[in-house]
Amino acid sequence: MTSDTPRTPHRSRPTRRTLLLGGGFAATGLLALGAGLAVAGAKERPLALVYDGPQGCDDCAPTIATVLKDSPRGYRVEYVGPGTGTALTAAALARAELYVQPGGGSDLDGVWSDLEPIADDLREWVQNGGSYLGLCFGAYLAGSEPGFDLLPGDAFGWAGSEGSTVPDDRDTVIPVTWRGDTRHVYFQDGPGFTIDDSADVDVLATYSDGTPAVLVAAYGKGRVGVAGPHPEADRSWYTEKGLSNSDGYSMDLAQDLIAATGR
């Protein structure tokens, strides 16, 4: 969430003063040109709106914002939601290519009370080509009851479910199979997903019991990407909870999900 006309040479010998002035004007012109190109480049980068309402965790929105800015597309990021100074509205969505509902919080009904008024507009925006990215808590909200109802199926609590290796809502590190490879990711009470038969879905990762953990689905002309785990978690998340990741702390999985969702 991520713009000189050549001079005709003088035939008389230039003085030191004219050389200095000319050099100063040229430098100023180049600086102005560079600043203009930087502004233009920033405007050309796609805009991502990241929800950062009061129910979210302190690090959730800033963490995914950093990953978005560092992505190959170099998203510009704007925070939206209560307390940010920018409301999530149809007009705000119209300026953006990607909307991110990060993780954090446990008050699903409380967050939904903030989001329900925009639900119809958000669904229409995705239907017409926008992209929704939901991470953990935001992945639950991509489902229904309550939620935006963007999935060809639904989200459910995977921790404690039959076949789950995580019995409760603890912070932990789990293995997933991501595009055929075993990878380890940060996990805290994220959802798994059910998928309707014949749905247009790309399952990027599954939990150890085969349940879809990360997927991207079509929704009209748009895309919906959801992750139960936190592929965007950086080293600080692990350190804070006394955890480590044997794979390291690369953002390659998060970038894979972003690229698949926001194409």
Task: Briefly describe each language-model feature range.
Residues 1-14, 25-32:
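N-terminal secretory signal peptides
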Residues 49-73:
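Short, charged N-terminal beta->alpha structural module
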Residues 33-45:
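C-terminal region of N-terminal signal peptides and the immediate post-cleavage residues
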Residues 106-178:
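A glycine-rich, often tryptophan-bearing local segment used as a flexible ligand/cofactor-contacting loop or short
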Residues 14-20:
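N-terminal export leaders
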Residues 46, 123, 229-263:
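Extracellular ligand-binding/catalytic regions of CAZymes and related secreted enzymes
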Residues 75-91:
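A short, well-structured beta->alpha microelement
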Residues 168-233:
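Catalytic beta-strand/loop cores that center a nucleophilic Ser/Cys/Thr
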